[in-house]
Amino acid sequence: DASFDLTMSIFGAMFAPRPFDVAREMVRVTRPGGRVVMGNWIPNDPSFISQLLRVSSAFSPPPPEGFISPMLWGVEDHIVERFGKAGVERASISTTRETFRFARADRTPADFIEAFRRFYGPTMNAFEAAEKNGRQDDLYRELVALAEEHNEAKDGGVSIPATFLKVTVCL
């Protein structure tokens, strides 16, 4: 309890199944005067990750009853509610839109999607579901086209921006 000066989760804790517990635990382990910092993807954003998740969900089965979308961590009102229930006042919570850039000079957009296919839970699940329906190639083509559309690299490689919500909670 109250052990850390900084508790940070970048695109991680947002995927935990019980968001109010996540906020409470992050507050619990952070000392008074410390900070909780999160980076969370934003729902319905036109940037890459939000669109990748939209495409992936179209190939996935519906979520189970009671499922709370991790994308709600990208909505300020939900953040305020979650940390508020953990005892944090609204004035101690700030959010800003920031950009994360996926950049690799030695990779193509197709390589990039292949990495997401193997290592990123939402796309792994979408590919598993698409394979069962014989639509794996459709999903792959759609995601590669999306990566190519968002790729800003001028001389080959990958440079894909993705907007996220930076959350700072001062305790």
What do these predicted ranges mean?
Residues 1-7:
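A short acidic, Gly/Pro-enriched loop at the edge of an enzyme's catalytic core
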Residues 11-14:
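Short catalytic micro-motifs in class I SAM-dependent methyltransferases
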Residues 16-26:
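A short, conserved alpha-helix within the catalytic core of class I
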Residues 20, 31-107, 123, 132:
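Conserved catalytic/acceptor-binding region of the Class I
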Residues 86-89, 110-113, 122, 160-171:
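Core SAM-dependent methyltransferase catalytic element
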Residues 90-154:
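C-terminal helical/coil "lid" or tail adjacent to the Rossmann-like core of SAM-dependent
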